[in-house]
Amino acid sequence: MSSSFRVALAVALATLLLVLGGLWLFGEEDKRDLPESLCGTRVSPQILEPLLPAEGDVSERNDVDRDHPQPASPCRVYVGDEVALRLRFAWHSDAIDPLQVAKSIHSVSNLSMPERADLPDATVIGNDGAISTTSCKTEAGSQFTLSVLLEGVNPTRDTYRAPLKNLMRTYFPAVVETLGCR
């Protein structure tokens, strides 16, 4: 091997190591901190991550008062300055069919392409959100319904169905546990 070839090879290897080391080192810095709770209930950041835009600080505005529940209480999750998720905590006296709610054009929880989900509570998943409901007796009513609506997603694509189902599988029962149902 000629000395110029050895120098070129050494420079190439050193450059490769610097690039890979930089990616490893700075890749961790770029990873943002996701919340470990959502609207007052613990949630795994790994379950929340696929539902949020990839960049921006995550914050929330939570108007849910579990001690004095209102018929409907919103909680909004922001990424940067934009709303990414809208959650609606609703207490009511009559049982509802979440599929009818999801299909109604008059509903604030209207979903695109809703289908029933194979989960313990009555749940529907759409391309842009999910609705779960269960019996939960409190001073605000005997039923509780949680709607999760994604903002800014294409309602014709089913990209978020699996992540929404994962969220509702774990998050909805955890929310219900915090409500003091009798």
Please give the residue ranges for each predicted region.
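Functional cleft and adjacent loop/helix regions within the main domain
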Residues: 1, 12, 52, 56
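Hydrophobic membrane-insertion alpha-helices, especially the h-region
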Residues: 2-27
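A small/polar (G/S/T-enriched), proline-flanked helix-loop surface module common
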Residues: 24-182
